[in-house]
Structures are given as structure tokens and as C-alpha cells.
């Protein structure tokens, strides 16, 4: 299967049934190829037969559970299914209700993987509340984290599979469903976790071969080709099948469902000067609350200091487990902002939802499309709410600075590659990361 790049071809010259000249206009990823599809009045799906992919591309925005009730899902075979729908469309509810109930009826087990501990804990609490409420009374917060069996699901965060014991645990079981929620994070997190690709493939190869593999995301662009590739690798060799009229059925290994997106509730505002937007927040009415995604811990602490401890709280991946642990757990449990401003790093891009009618402002110091969609999605809207979305547009100088950092990093990678290729003998402490880590 050609999963990396597809080509859109323009026919320049044709004679009879023969094409004499073809011009390659653009390389296309699978996601771009799907975007290029034209509406078809006769059917809502399109097969890419050479790639064994079927795309359903005409679903209106609605709750996932309405589109995939139990009677439809029961007809699914042990193949791959990608569900692309924006945040707030009930993907997690579909998992904890529809799929969980199916598993209980069939006396089967499902494996549920998420990229964030916060999202894992959210799933565990919801499944426990529905199917084993006694666990919520018996277990402490740490106990909930260590427990993995909740009703019909085994629930893990992807980071836990750095442990060989966790890998052995899933290899010893037979799963009816393997569900990867927020699956885009397997690529997005690779910048700070070099094992995400290995974990992704390991989970599907070891636990997913004989299961229905479900991938959930609102931002599939960075992961779709990898999903298609691994689906080809783990799918058994095709056995021709025929319909009732004797026509061969298409060899579909991966089915993609794309739901329409609706961001009509968003009022976008772009800015470059950080001080300007800070001034606006300092004068924001006390009746409104704001969610601010900063670039770094340093920036987050600066914003907290300028807005004041009485109005703002800063959380990151570290202090949510230490001095901010109680506040973070309250946020997970009640999904409300305690102070006027919640300042966070990107650790909260998935897994934490805020159902707060007073939250009217979201500020992003991130401009990648995946970041914008996921961070905006932490605010869950109801009715006719309008959200002001402030997005920083980097200056030319800032962009040049980032380009310089990338060029320096690329040069360092090249030097390390040459060192390894030439097998230069050196002390162990001089080896490049990750071949050496200073243990303390």
C-alpha cells in the first residue's frame, strides 16, 4: 500500500484510451486525498481500492452514539475504523456506553488507550461510576491510577507501555475492541517521547490483530498515513469475497468516518504583542473567565504573577502532581475553573474538559492547527455560547529564531550520525543522547 505520499495527476495529452503525457501537480497525503474528494449524489462513500481504504465523507455534525448504535457496530469485522469528529461530539460517551454495553453483553473485553494520564483517569472514573461504583469508594486517587480493569475495559495511558510488565499483561489477553483515543498524540508527542511509534505499533501488533481497531481523533492529519500503513501490516492476506450477485467485494482494511465540523461559536482574534493581550485580560470583567495556553513554564509563571494569585492559577505537567494536585483533581472532577484565569501548558491539550458557562475567553500561544483545535476543544460549549479565541501570530523575527533553532538541531543530529557511522571511540559520557543518560 502506498501510504506516504499520493499524487494528483493532470492529464495533458490523451489519444484514444492511451495517456501520452502526465504532469504531477502535487504530492498528497491520505488526509489531503480525502479532502480532495468531490461530493457524490449517488453514494456517501468512496473506495481507494489500491490502498484498501473506504471513506465516508458526508456525515453532518451530530453525536457519535446516534450514528453508531450497537446494532450497527455489531456488524463490524476485525478491521480498522477511524472516527474523525470535533471535540464535544460524544466520542468518549460512545466508548463508555455503547461499546462497553456491547462488551458486557458478549462477555468480552476491550482495551482502551489514551495519550494523557488525565484522560485515562477521566475514563476510569466514568467506567467505574457506570459499572463498578464500589471502586470509587474503595480506592484512593493513587489506587485508581494503578487499577486498570474497569467494567469491560482495560484502561491504560500510552506512557505505561514503557514497562515490559504492562506489555506482557495485554499480550496475555484476547480483546474484542482496541480503542486508541486522541490517536494523533502518538505522533504529536514524539517530540518529547521517542518511543511513541514503537508503542503504537506494538499495541496494534500484539493486542489488535484479532480485534476491531478503533481510532478516535478530531485532528487526523498527522497520524492518518501511519494508521493506514500499520493496518496493512497487521491485516491478514486478503481472501476474495463476493456479494449475492457474484460481484467481488472490495478489499477494505480501513474505514474512515469523517463528520462535519462547526466552529460557528468561535470569534477569532489574532495578536502579536503579548503585552497588549495581557492588558486586555487585566481589565476583563470579573463575570468572565479565561483559559490560557502558554508556551513554557516560565511564561506561565510570569502571567500568573502579572494577573495576581487571587485571579489566576498556573498548572503544568509537574505541579499538577505536587502543589497543585488538589486543584487539578477538582478540575477533573467538577470541570469548572476555580479562579478567573486558568493558565496551563500543552499538557492539558487533551483529557481535561471545562463545562463552565463563565469561560468566555481562550488564549493560545500556539499556532499549529492540531494545537488550536485540541486546545480550543477543552472548552465545551452549550446552546448559543460564543467564545473569543485569541491566537498569537508569531512575528517574522520570532519565526527566524525558531528556524535557527531547527537548523542547529538538524546540524547536531548530523554530527551525531557521523559519530555513530564512523564508530568513534569515546568515553560513555560523551555519547550523544539518547545513547547516554546521566543517572543521579
Question: PLM features: residue spans?
Answer:
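N-terminal helicase ATP-binding lobe
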Residues: 1-216, 220-341, 347-352, 356-372, ...
Amino acid at each position: 500500500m502506498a501510504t506516504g505520499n499520493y499524487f494528483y495527476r493532470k492529464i495533458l495529452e490523451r489519444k484514444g484510451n492511451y495517456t501520452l503525457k502526465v504532469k504531477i501537480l502535487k504530492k498528497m497525503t491520505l488526509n489531503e486525498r480525502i479532502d480532495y474528494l468531490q461530493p457524490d449524489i449517488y453514494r456517501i462513500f468512496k473506495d481507494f481500492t489500491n490502498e484498501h481504504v473506504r471513506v465516508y465523507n458526508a456525515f453532518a455534525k451530530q453525536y457519535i452514539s446516534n450514528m453508531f448504535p450497537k446494532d450497527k457496530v455489531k456488524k463490524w469485522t476485525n478491521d480498522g475504523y477511524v472516527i474523525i469528529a470535533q471535540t464535544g461530539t460524544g466520542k468518549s460517551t460512545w466508548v463508555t456506553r455503547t461499546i462497553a454495553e456491547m462488551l458486557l453483553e458478549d462477555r468480552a473485553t476491550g482495551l482502551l488507550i489514551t495519550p494523557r494520564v488525565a484522560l485515562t483517569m477521566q475514563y476510569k472514573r466514568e467506567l467505574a461510576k457506570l459499572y463498578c461504583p464500589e471502586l470509587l469508594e474503595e480506592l484512593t486517587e493513587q489506587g485508581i491510577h494503578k487499577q486498570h480493569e474497569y467494567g469491560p475495559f482495560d484502561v491504560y495511558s500510552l506512557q505505561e507501555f514503557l514497562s515490559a510488565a504492562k506489555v506482557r499483561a495485554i499480550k496475555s489477553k484476547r480483546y474484542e475492541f482496541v480503542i486508541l483515543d486522541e490517536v494523533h498524540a502518538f505522533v504529536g508527542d514524539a517530540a518529547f517521547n521517542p518511543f511513541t511509534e514503537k508503542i503504537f505499533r506494538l499495541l496494534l501488533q500484539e493486542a489488535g490483530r484479532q480485534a476491531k481497531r478503533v481510532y478516535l481523533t478530531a485532528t487526523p492529519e498527522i497520524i492518518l498515513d501511519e494508521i493506514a500503513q500499520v493496518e496493512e501490516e497487521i491485516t491478514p492476506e486478503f481472501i476474495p469475497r463476493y456479494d449475492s450477485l457474484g460481484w467481488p467485494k472490495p478489499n477494505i482494511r480501513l474505514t474512515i468516518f469523517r463528520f462535519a465540523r462547526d466552529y460557528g461559536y468561535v470569534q477569532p482574534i489574532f495578536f502579536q504583542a503579548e503585552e497588549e493581550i495581557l492588558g486586555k485580560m487585566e481589565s476583563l470583567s470579573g463575570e468572565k473567565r479565561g483559559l490560557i495556553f502558554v508556551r513554557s513554564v516560565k511564561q506561565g509563571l510570569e502571567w500568573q504573577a502579572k494577573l495576581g494569585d487571587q485571579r489566576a492559577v498556573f498548572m503544568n505537567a509537574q505541579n499538577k502532581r505536587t502543589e497543585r494536585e488538589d486543584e487539578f483533581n477538582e478540575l477533573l472532577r467538577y470541570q469548572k475553573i476555580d479562579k478567573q484565569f486558568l493558565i496551563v501548558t500543552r499538557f492539558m491539550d487533551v483529557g481535561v474538559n471545562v463545562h463552565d458557562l463563565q469561560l468566555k475567553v481562550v488564549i493560545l500561544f500556539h499556532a499549529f492547527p492540531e494545537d488550536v483545535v485540541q486546545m480550543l476543544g477543552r472548552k465545551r460549549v452549550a446552546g448559543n455560547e460564543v467564545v473569543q479565541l485569541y491566537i498569537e501570530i508569531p512575528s517574522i523575527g520570532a519565526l527566524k529564531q525558531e528556524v535557527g533553532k531547527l537548523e542547529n538541531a538538524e546540524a547536531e543530529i548530523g554530527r551525531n550520525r557521523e559519530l555513530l557511522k564512523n564508530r568513534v571511540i569515546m568515553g560513555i559520557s560523551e555519547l550523544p543522547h539518547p545513547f547516554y543518560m546521566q543517572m543521579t
